[in-house]
Curated annotation (Swiss-Prot):
GO-annotated cellular components: plasma membrane; proton-transporting ATP synthase complex
Source taxonomy: Bacteria, Bacillati, Actinomycetota, Actinomycetes, Mycobacteriales
The protein's role, per its UniProt record: Produces ATP from ADP in the presence of a proton gradient across the membrane. The catalytic sites are hosted primarily by the beta subunits.
Record's subcellular location: Cell membrane
A single GO molecular function term of this UniProt record: proton-transporting ATP synthase activity, rotational mechanism
Gene source species: Mycolicibacterium gilvum (strain PYR-GCK) (Mycobacterium gilvum (strain PYR-GCK))
Protein name: ATP synthase subunit beta
């Protein structure tokens, strides 16, 4: 009886194309979509078990699968066993303080977590009746974020930017700021990014004493596309357990959501699907929706997600970042132009947005000051062409004054960050929201027009401004 059962759940490899493996099963024993299959192989005298995920039914008892590990050493005819379940990961308090891969294997302590409760990474989003909209602001202590693009507690927040403008540094900054003050559980998903950054993050979290409350799940750049496509779901599953079973508010950090889309594109091509716009997979919106719809707040508990989104060639019309926009509550756009001025974080205040920058949510005073800052910066941007052609002296007196004020505003939106302390030698500063609103209100009204521009550069609040101004021979 046992041998018969084994025959019904075992198949043979018939074709291998990179990470795509076709497997033939006996009639009537074809595994379901998303089932995990195991194949034992020996390569260079090392034995290992490959995990394959069923992606397509080809007919004639054939299934097309995606390998979660490199397929070196896999040959035709190797026996493949159907586990009968989809990929699952360990969940619960035991995952905190440890690093896992997309399959739920512990990387810092091999074998750890095998006896934990496991949840499938393929889960349905909460029913509509259980969802709870959130409008509470999540204070970060970063002036530019809190004033102009306030984050929603229990919302989806994204940091957009091209290569090298500071997305990962800002994600690390948010982990430092929010996780330290948050007191809850954090889950970090490293999706297709550099292994070095993952190691740096581990060390930083340990130094900040928040590692004990953080679970890390990594599928890095050197992993096959199947792993990079599934690692975000693995991390999200761990976060869902804390939300649904332990009734906790959870922070979910994803770096980088573009790599999730990119991995889906690679897999789609290998599966033989017709490419869509710019070569992306035709199922791009569906795949993004399946992930984002699960990141949500339910009654009394929430998942607050912060996602870094790489923008290919700084093109915001690219389908990958464009598809992400639709799911977000707040967007922080990092600009190469702002970065080139040495203003950090390099947030573009005119392109960033938030659904809760509304007087009914943040209050009339906050909204009024934010709109005045945006008005001045927008007018300054409109005047740039005239200044470039005719020079600043040709402007009306009112516009000259506005330009000087806008330049001070730009510099005051910069801030020394905790994640950059080792480079700048300056401790990171946290500015309470009330002080941020007061300082920018005074600045827009011209109360600081007599101070040199340099006094506003890379500082925190009003106390820092007073010290910097004094060091430059001026007084508030």
């Amino acid at each position: 009886m046992t041998s018969t059962e084994e025959k019904t759940t075992s198949g043979r490899v018939v074709r291998i194309t990179g990470p795509v493996v076709d497997v033939e099963f006996p009639r009537g024993s074809v595994p379901e979509l998303f089932n995990a299959l195991h194949a034992d192989i020996t390569y260079k005298e090392l034995s290992k078990t490959l995990t394959l995920e069923v992606a397509q039914h080809l007919g004639d008892n054939l299934v097309r699968t995606i390998s979660m590990q490199p397929t070196d050493g896999l040959v035709r005819g190797v026996e493949v066993t159907d586990t009968g379940n989809s990929i699952s990961v360990p969940v619960g308090d035991g995952v905190k303080g440890h690093v896992f891969n997309a399959l739920g294997d512990c990387l810092d302590e091999p074998g750890y977590g095998k006896d934990f409760e496991h949840w499938s990474i393929h889960r349905k989003p909460p029913p509509f009746s259980e969802l709870e909209p959130r409008t509470e602001m999540l204070e970060t202590g970063l002036k530019v974020v809190d004033l102009l693009t306030p984050y929603v507690r229990g919302g989806k927040i994204a940091l957009f930017g091209g290569a090298g403008v500071g997305k990962t540094v800002l994600i690390q900054e948010m982990i430092n700021r929010i996780a330290r003050n948050f007191g809850g559980t954090s889950v970090f998903a490293g999706v297709g990014e550099r292994t070095r950054e993952g190691n740096d993050l581990w060390v930083e979290l340990e130094d900040a004493n928040v590692l004990k409350d953080t679970a890390l799940v990594f599928g890095q750049m050197d992993e096959p596309p199947g792993t990079r496509m599934r690692v975000a779901l693995s991390a999200l599953t761990m976060a869902e357990f804390f939300r649904d079973e332990q009734q906790q508010d959870v922070l979910l950090f994803i770096d980088n959501i573009f790599r999730f889309t990119q991995a889906g594109s690679e897999v789609s091509t290998l599966l033989g699907r017709m490419p869509s716009a710019v070569g992306y997979q035709p199922t791009l919106a569906d795949e993004m929706g399946e992930l984002q719809e699960r990141i949500t707040s339910t009654r009394g508990r929430s998942i607050t997600s912060m996602q870094a989104v790489y923008v290919p060639a700084d093109d915001y019309t690219d389908p990958a970042p464009a598809t992400t926009f639709a799911h977000l509550d707040a967007t922080t756009e990092l600009s190469r132009t702002v970065f080139s001025k040495g203003i950090f974080p390099a947030v573009d205040p005119l392109a960033s947005s938030s659904t809760i920058l509304d007087p009914a949510v943040v209050g009339d005073e906050h909204y009024r000051v934010a709109q005045e800052v945006i008005r001045i910066l927008q007018r300054y941007k409109d005047l740039q062409d005239i200044i470039a052609i005719l020079g600043i002296d040709e402007l009306a007196e009112e516009d000259k004054q506005l330009v000087q004020r806008a330049r001070r505003l730009e510099r005051f939106l910069s801030q020394n960050m905790m994640a950059a302390e080792q480079f700048t030698g300056q401790p990171g500063s946290t500015v309470p929201l009330k002080e941020t609103i007061e300082a920018f209100d005074k600045l827009t009204k011209g109360e600081f027009d007599h101070l040199p521009e340099q006094a506003f550069f890379l500082i925190g609040g009003l106390d820092d401004l007073a010290k910097k101004a004094e060091s430059l021979g001026a007084k508030l």
